[in-house]
Amino acid sequence: MPEKGRAGEAAAASFLEEKGMKIMERNFRSPRTVRGGEVDIIALDGETLVFAEVKTWSTREIDALEQSIDNKKQRKIIETAKYFLSLNRKYIYMAIRFDVIFISPEGITHLASAFTERV
């Protein structure tokens, strides 16, 4: 992973912790056989399990950033979240949320509930 991406994920994790969330996993991967991918951050926000995708960009063109999380990427994140839940059954009855965190030189933009499983 490029240094910019690592730094962005570290900033996003710190940001979520400052908001009172507990970071449970970073860079969680599912096997290729599951058709998933990677979830950058898995966190607890009270009684809600949050799966967060972090995007680090050198500009703050929010439209381009939002388009970077297309339906295919959303499906991969959802499949990876399902795989995480299959391994961690104690969380299967919790509320689930999919967030996107954009990191740019201007700051952090956190989109809670950026997409849902209906993708």
Model-predicted segments: where are they?
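Short, conserved glycine- and acidic-residue-centered signature motifs
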Residues: 1, 5, 9, 35, ...
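Acidic-basic catalytic patches of nuclease active cores, encompassing PD-(D/E)XK
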Residues: 1-28
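Active-site metal-binding core of divalent-cation-utilizing nuclease and nuclease-like domains
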Residues: 22-49
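Anionic group-transfer/hydrolysis microenvironments
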Residues: 27, 40-42, 55-57, 101, ...
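Catalytic cores of nucleic-acid endonucleases
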Residues: 31, 56-106
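Conserved catalytic cores of phosphodiester-cleaving nucleases, focusing on short active-site segments
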Residues: 39-60, 77
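Protein kinase-like catalytic core scaffold
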Residues: 48-50, 99, 109
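Short, low-complexity, polybasic intrinsically disordered segments
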Residues: 103-119
